[in-house]
Amino acid sequence: MKNFTCIPGLIFILVTVSFFDMNLNAQENKITDARGKMKPWKEGAWIRGKYRNIFLEAGYKQADIDAKLAKAYSDVFEGPGKVYFEVGDSMAYVSDVKNHDARTEGLSYGMMIAVQLNKKDVFDRLWRWSKTYLQHQSGPREGYFAWSINPQTLKHNSEGSASDGELYFITDLLFASNRWGNNTGINYYAEARRIIDAMWVKDGSNGITNIFNKEHKQITFTPDTFGYNWTDPSYHLPAFFELWAEYAKDGREQFYRDCADTARMFLHRACHPVTGLNSDYTEFSGAPKSTPWMPAAFRYDSWRVPMNIAMDYSWFAKDKAWQQDYARHLQDFLSGKGINTFEDQYNLDGSLPDYILQAGGYKKLRHSIGLVATAASASIMGTQEKSWRFVDALWNAKLEPYSDGYFDPYYDGLLYLFSIMHLSGNYQIIKPITSN
């Protein structure tokens, strides 16, 4: 019994320390703001026809908001740290410069930014390059895209696809069709349908599958036998699936609406009920999935989830109660870590992971602008006073090298630009032009 004589005292100390820590966290989360509690809209833009300008609501001047968006675009597409590179008279690509490749992720993000900001030449250049150098024109993968390429040698780093690339390309092209029509040099709708139609004839033959797992009505990690039976939560964009039901016009409207509903319910399961965090990869049940290259945790892919949920709220607001609750949990957790100091990788319970996923040759935790940005976008669903502080944090953030020299104008930069678009009301559903 001698070894246990100190246990009561130890318990007292642990309880006292735990209570002290909880009290500190509670104090950290009691953030007040003169602007009061945020009040999210009750209807999405699909019905309301309008988009919130959160920056304006936060007290920033419209001229400054316009300048902020213009500078963010310039930094990512035109400045000395740009990731957009023109090739000849009619093509361009977006490069993950820190990893020396071009990806369907970045190319399709660039196209989305271009169609949102009405930059047709940029959109067309990116599409031509993607179609020429990444899209498979024949064989089992016909219509799909190689997800990574060396832009200097034009050699594919992989022939396989990442399902989010096709997801964005299709949505980009449908939006372009709605905005610019199909008679200005590129038949955007036909290009979107080519990908969609190619997707639906892939039945697993030669190992190539649909982008969707048809049984689960969920997007796959990769449309092949390797990734067909699991997923990436950041690929679950119910807002996009809703729009496919409206604009793809391929007779599968109900399937896409079912996928949107399923994606929302999937996110309920994938996101931790206290921290709001999700794993980069999961089973279709939402259970975290480890892979041979890394254990399950909230890492870089997961940064996109708050922004995706905010988009769904802004556009459709079909899952308001849960999405507001999600924003509260996530922002409570991050503010508890310090709005200006929270790290960029976590275990789902909020503890720091033992394994740190490196980026661009750097293997360390940092306060990354990409997560600062997407955490701020969650304020679209915010109901607390502290949600304003996340908006302010994004407003004050700078897309520039960190003190150790690390700089990511690609992933950090694109998420930064996307989030500024969301919070300024410039990331919108593009409906077809109607003639009077």
Where are these regions (language model features)?
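Bacterial Sec-dependent N-terminal signal peptides
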Residues: M1-Q27
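Extended ligand-binding clefts on enzyme/binding-domain cores
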Residues: K30-K71, H100-T104, G139-Y144, S158-D164, ...
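Aromatic-rich carbohydrate-recognition surfaces in CAZymes
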Residues: H100-G110, H156-W180
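C-terminal functional modules
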Residues: L352-N436
